[in-house]
């Protein structure tokens, strides 16, 4: 199957409507039974209330998963999505009191409940740890109702606007995904032309896109002020369960080694025979670029996963066979790729925009890595499944490494050169580029006032050039390329999580290949199965690593240097 089968969630919209109305009533009953009464409950009664709360949250997740997936297939159908956002607000409002009232219990009572509810102790402890950022019940209610007219509304506007963009190219109207795939074309004229055409469309929409990112910035500033967050990014670190110190250390390590980016691209310029490497040359193919149709990629991924773990294979096989994956680009379909965790009574759903390129093979592996992680995390209860972004991206990048290792032994030298170059560029995109994005966001959100397009462009160019140093010439057209990146809109300060995951995976994968950890596979599957029920520090600690140690990041960076050295040796043979 090449398109989603959403019947695992709901058979039709009527079933969705009936389920939603039932859950609204259930949430009203929950509010009636427990609001202003938590302090009167004994431990068994509180555990039952907690499970009821969890079930209602899972129902919410199920409703919005179905609605969001329909929207992702056709982003012009925003009214249906908005309708159910409003319906779900009714449920959310009825549940709003629970976490707030738990945090207001006496320390003795909250500790008694936390100790008794062993399966939820990490979740409850986190609530207590961050309760200083809570507002009053009435204030939280106002925030809830305003949320769909704030950043969420601008996120939807961004999605609808970007998916509607058509880029004129050689007599055709291309989507964002289709024109960006031209950046990998071997013909420099095509790359240059595609970059110019895409830039022109972004520039044409710059007023709208600049306004959207300014509104995201303003709302984040206001929420930080209201909740008492120390800065615009701290709420992301809290949800990622990582310290500001650890994030700063990660960024400093990346910046310290920007020379690896420069080293690689200078060699690439030599290989291509160019006097100057431009921004549209970054992904120019080296050697023979292999093409992978979806069937070929499916078989490669399944074989690579099978070689690592039968569990990985079984989950991926089900994804291919049972309508978990929506494969090809379509008009009005959301761009990019994702794996949505959905709920444990269904299964994850993967969105692709597959165009038979080598990078599509690795995108497939990446998203199925998420799928495997999400499916394994169904082993813990719904409130414990919410994995921090830092560890959520680990499984996806690890899956890419499995596929890279699997196919590199099966390629000819010319294809191997291309594979190595592409893998290194993928690592740069996942590590260094995400640090570049985070530094761009830091500067953007540090500005008090609304920024003009020109001011945003300037910050973007300055931060981008730091990464490339003198190895890549950024043309003036590149100045607007911040404006199509969805993470800046949907999830501010998300991007460092990719960098974190990349270095963590390189450290883990190096440990796996070294065979120094005899039970690595069992430990790794256990780590994924724990979902968000323990901290990232504890998860990584299972392998003997300490993410708070600033030297930890150097382990992954050494693996990047090793890959670059292997590429250099291969190229000089």
Regions found by a protein language model. Give the residues of each.
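Long, K/E/R/D-enriched contiguous segments that form extended
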Residues: 267, 271-307, 313, 317, ...
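Conserved binding/catalytic microenvironments
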Residues: 322, 352, 359-361, 367, ...
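Active-site recognition of the HExxH zinc-binding catalytic motif
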Residues: 228, 355-375, 396, 401, ...
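A well-structured
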Residues: 1-287, 569-573
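Catalytic zinc-binding patch centered on the HExxH motif and its immediate surroundings
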Residues: 290-292, 325-347
